[in-house]
């Protein structure tokens, strides 16, 4: 993984690479127009892009998708009057374009075409931009944070208090016991999977990780090929059923943590 995308409130401090003094940029004060280097505890590094919070919010909730031209003008107008390379970028849920906002996908398409046809900006992707303009600054992020919850990762484990305001009397006290139950079940299933899977797979956990290949293509030919590779031998019909049940069990053990269920 070369890079990731975070919210502007997920960074704590920043400095130019090579300098000693850090600058506090907590609370969303980071400049989102450049990539940053983040040094990991493992000794490795990763590049981070912090998306433009105000524009992203207006796209998702402020009606900016009502006009593709207005959206293009907002993006193009956000470049600073500097000669150095700059990236103006946003991050929103995919369902924003068409599901939350009818014809939002058309507005986005018009916006991108307008930017290019009018010569207002070059449309790029993170990988290309990072290759051309590597980080000149480094950051330290806020540990245990998330883009969607100001309480860190509280949304997935406790009564963090996030709500839409539609039901002021509601609370999320149910999250803590549900999370504890999910964690207990996950551990119980992991023990079963490892015990039952060692007689079917060369490496049960590698098979679990590689199972994405079957999820993406459930044709009989692909399933047979996958199981033969992971088992190192031809499985009987009964063993095939058992192997697939174990893999599906592990898949659902991960699905129970899907964020939608914790809102």
Residue ranges and their predicted role:
Residues 4-5, 89:
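Structural recognition of the beta-strand scaffold that forms the well-ordered cores
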Residues 7-11:
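Short, acidic/turn-prone active-site loops that include or flank metal/cofactor-
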Residues 22-263:
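Active-site and substrate-binding clefts of carbohydrate-active enzymes
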């Amino acid at each position: 993984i070369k890079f990731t995308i975070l919210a502007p409130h997920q960074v704590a401090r920043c400095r130019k690479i090579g300098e000693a003094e850090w600058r506090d940029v907590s609370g969303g004060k980071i400049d989102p127009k450049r990539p940053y280097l983040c040094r990991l505890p493992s000794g490795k590094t990763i590049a981070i892009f912090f998306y433009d919070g105000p524009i992203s919010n207006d796209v998702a909730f402020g009606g900016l998708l009502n006009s593709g031209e207005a959206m293009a003008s907002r993006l193009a107008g956000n470049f600073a009057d500097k000669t150095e390379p700059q990236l103006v970028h946003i991050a929103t849920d995919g369902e924003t374009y068409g599901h939350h906002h009818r014809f939002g996908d058309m507005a986005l398409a018009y916006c991108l075409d307008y930017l290019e046809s009018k010569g207002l900006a070059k449309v790029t992707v993170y990988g290309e931009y990072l290759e051309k303009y590597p980080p000149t600054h480094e950051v330290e992020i806020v540990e245990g944070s998330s883009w969607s919850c100001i309480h860190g990762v509280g949304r997935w484990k406790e009564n963090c208090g996030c709500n839409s305001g539609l039901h002021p009397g509601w609370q999320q006290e149910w999250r803590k016991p549900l999370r504890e139950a999910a964690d207990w079940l996950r551990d119980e299933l992991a023990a079963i999977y490892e015990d039952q899977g060692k007689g079917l797979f060369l490496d049960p956990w590698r098979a679990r990780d590689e199972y994405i290949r079957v999820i993406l293509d459930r044709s009989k030919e692909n399933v047979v090929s996958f199981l033969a590779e992971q088992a190192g031998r031809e499985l009987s019909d009964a063993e095939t059923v058992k192997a697939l049940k174990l893999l599906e069990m592990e898949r659902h053990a991960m699905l129970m943590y899907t964020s939608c269920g914790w809102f």
